[in-house]
Amino acid sequence: NSIHDMDREKLFEKFLEDCKNRKEWCGQGNPNADILIIGQESTDISEEALIRNIMLCRDKKDRDAPRPIDPKNKTWANYQELLDEIYCRKSEYIDKWDFEKFAFTTELSSTPRKQRNYKEAKPSIKERIVFFKDSDFIQDFSVIILACGGYIKNDDKVREIDNTFHVEFCKEYGSKESKNRFWTHIDKKDPRKLVIHTRQFSNGISKDLIKEMASVIREHLRKLGLI
C-alpha cells in the first residue's frame, strides 16, 4: 500500500511515538492539513514542554484551536499572513491566530537557539533530517515549507533537500541580491509534492515574498484539486 492510502492519523501517531522516544519536539497544528511548515527551532523544549506538546497533539479538539496573538512572535504572525494569502481568507478572530487549522508546524532543530550555537547543534540537526527523511508522516504532505534557512541545503556538493524529500530543484524566486528568496522543488515521479526552501519567517521577511510564495502554493493546491 502507498503511504498516501494510509490514514494520516496513523502516520501521525507513529511520528508522535518516535518523537517521544527520541525526546524531540513533535510540533503543533492540524496533522491532516495539506501544508507542513518546518521552522528552525522551538523556543522551549524542556522535558515538561515536550510532554505537554505530545499531549496537545493527541487532543483532537484543541490541537489546532486558535491561539492568543503574541505580539513578540513575528514568526507566527507571518505564518498567519501566508496561510491567509494561500486560502484568500482572514482570521475569524481579532485577537487570535487560527492558521493552525490549515497547517502543521514543526522544527528542524530540537535544541533552542539560546542554549547553544549552530556548531553544537549541527549533529542533532543532521540526525533530525534523517528522521524526517524516514518519516511517512512528514513525507505525506502536499506542500512542505522549509522555513529554516541554512539549517538544510542544496548546493553543488550536498543535495540535502533533494535526498531528504525525494525531490529535484525546480525554480528560484526573488532577486539574487535579496535575502527574501525561495526555491521550489518537486518530485518528478509524484508531482503531488511541492517542497519550498526559504529563510526563517521571523523579522525581515518581506510582504512580497509571502505573497509570491502563497501564489505558488495556491496554484499547486489548485492543480491537485485541494482548493
What function would you assign to each model-found segment?
Residues 1-75, 128-135, 181-189, 222-227:
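Active-site and ligand/interface coordination hotspots across diverse enzymes
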Residues 37, 145, 195-197:
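Structural motif
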Residues 61-75, 109-126, 200:
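Surface-exposed cleft-lining segments at the edges of enzyme active sites
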Residues 95-113:
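Short, contiguous, well-structured surface segments enriched in hydrophobic/aromatic residues
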Residues 133-150:
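Proline-aspartate-enriched helix->loop->beta-strand connector
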